[in-house]
UniProtKB/Swiss-Prot annotation:
UniProt-recorded Gene Ontology molecular function terms: L-cysteine desulfhydrase activity
Superkingdom of origin: Bacteria
Species annotation: Shewanella oneidensis (strain ATCC 700550 / JCM 31522 / CIP 106686 / LMG 19005 / NCIMB 14063 / MR-1)
Family: Belongs to the UPF0597 family.
Protein name per Swiss-Prot or TrEMBL: UPF0597 protein SO_1403
A GO biological-process term: L-cysteine catabolic process to pyruvate
Amino acid sequence: MKPQWQQYIQIINQVVKPALGCTEPIAAAYAAAVARTLLNDDPDSIAVQVSDNLYKNSMGVYVPGTGKIGLAIAAAAGALAGNADAGLEVLASVTPEQVAQAQALIDAAKVKVERTETDEFIYCCVTLTSGEQEAMVKICGGHTLIAEKRLNGELVFTADNAQAKATGSICDGVDINIESIYRFAEEVPFEEIQFILKASELNSKLSDEGMSKPYGLEVGRTMKNGIAAGIIGEDLLNKIVMLTAAASDARMGGANLPAMSNLGSGNQGIAATIPVVITAQCYKVSEEKLARALIMSHLGAIYIKSHYPPLSAFCGNTVTSAAASMAMVYLAGGSFEQSCFAIQNVISDSSGMVCDGAKASCAMKVSTSSSAAVRSFLMALSSQNVSGQGIIANHVEKTIKNIGKMVLNGMSSTDVTIINIMSE
């Protein structure tokens, strides 16, 4: 196998992985669980310091297994009940009794959460104290990327800068672009990428959960009711939007099921997966072709998002759905050129969507971007594409660079304004 392809598989394995609950509060739970292994005792108090973006994405989302919202319960549950070896599934085994213990710590004002100034978009520092003992774990650059551990002020671990790599820079130094991703997905031996089918399994289970139970805003179930009432039809567009939104409903509503995440985001893992799975069912393709399309979608999303910070004022579901749309064209038998058209079309359609934190209404944004993916894939199959208009360049690679410029240079103040509004 080509060394370049081995790099691609390594990237996918690094950032396409199961995550139980929204990854921002889960980062605090994970840091707390790791700190607890240093302390070797239950904490008397917990202090949590986070970046503005991590704070923003933790304010309105349920923490799985707890039925509660926010960083305080995430950190307390992680410290008292978290499995430090489980990564983003750190809270998979939390019990109601342990949640009650965590809430008691919060009620006793023993859990403190505050924002801190930092250049890192993903930053979380958790300090646990028990009597005279103190343990600290610092996460930087990625939701489970530990930068430092201290016990009673003594440094016990620091990340090797040569090995530690922030998720946003994961494609640095890698020979990768949209065409190389497309060719890789087309040609790599099936057995090397068969693992990606786990994304279909996990995210489809979340979709089923969101359709069967009342989570969040019930975006998916509301569409189901509309179909049953004869108001809308159960065509490909509505089925994709309904089932993708339902998975997000369940995730944002605290369902105790993992999502296969993409670059630290469960919702974006859902957006990269469910539209592709439903399209594969529509065209009755083989399991192998579905796997190739999922690789195209997930790696395409990773590549596009590597052009800007992992947390920002820009809703990443837009470009994730662009990658999904590219894969949908592939499933329908379209050309590489038409797959590029699909990316251009989605970005033109919904690139103005902002991120104002993780919460129930994210399911609406997921449904919006998934809808754009379907429209754009249909247009692309007819060779209709946006080109040389606004931020959309004449070539897909230039468009992707433009998105990076827009987020990096144009949306920093937007992000600050959004966070300030949310904190009022």
